[in-house]
């Protein structure tokens, strides 16, 4: 049924494609889930059309969209930081 609430753990999986929108921005940035911890999602660092990395401000709100087996999962998250090894990634809060 449309609008049903689902737990993030049932939808989000390592390797899954996700799309992000930053606060006050309608540009879509594509990414992929690299790892999932108890409280964080580690996602590949998105790049813009010129292949420049997108790095939000710490604490910036993000809107995410992932397509699951039978649903489109929308969620809000917060940018916590970035890392570069072994690949450039964002560290964001894990939605509930």
Each model region followed by its residue ranges:
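Structured alpha-helical
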Residues: 1-96
